[in-house]
């Protein structure tokens, strides 16, 4: 979750030769406001005002250091929390699965805060590349999910979870992985934006197509959920960033910390709530998730090669196809398939796994790019 994990701003020369900024916000934002906690409120207020004294500046510097540390070791932190939730679920039982939608909505607002009009430039300057990538996104992963449910003969409660992961848009953490892989960052950002915009229409339709025989799928209800939890917060964040950019520039510096904390919370909530069942079928779920993710990488890259795209574009499409907004998959499973508690598990496991595999693949791609030179 997807990306579905941290925000990174990277400046560099993209394939069109211009200096651009890649902004990335995978995952969700943790807020315990509903539980009366004041941490989030405190820091939101501080971030909306530039520090005007040495004490506040020092606090911000400390927060930035924590943010950098959490971003760097995000995969390790998520794995550790997943293990804790699995083997000692009572320690994180205070994090409820009912928080998932709120967390995802807040992170999408954060994603909107990082978006600028030029992030959509690639959609108009290179529409062919974006179309190829998005078609691959919404054909490869849903079809792979469907095939895996058949091959492994998954029960309906797990099958719908796997299919939801496949039908969701690309995860936003794919942007930073593309940057690390020396891929086409502009294309990655454009694909993420377009696939997210298309999600309210295609995710319910594809879920109905591939899972409709197993479970009841209410497409209209899913459409409204995605609009409410994803599209509206992104638009609001985009508008706020446009009119209050001086304030949001300071806020985005620590969004990775909030985002990563949220992913950890979502994983902890889902895993702890289903720890007993995971212990009995965990290896099966993990095998399906790994195959889904790795085959997505491979087929995404192959599609780019077959269509004679250059290596930077192939790397971007590979990572974009393989990494999903698994946070959205978890949210939809919890909201629309509550009668199947295990449906949330594939999304949670995918959130852990794809951040690990994405980093490994990005490193391999980067080495390959270096050897080519």
List each language-model region with its residue ranges.
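N-terminal chloroplast transit peptides
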Residues: 5-6
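Alpha-helical transmembrane segments of multi-pass small-molecule/ion transporters
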Residues: 13, 37, 46-47, 51-373
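Family-specific functional microsites
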Residues: 30
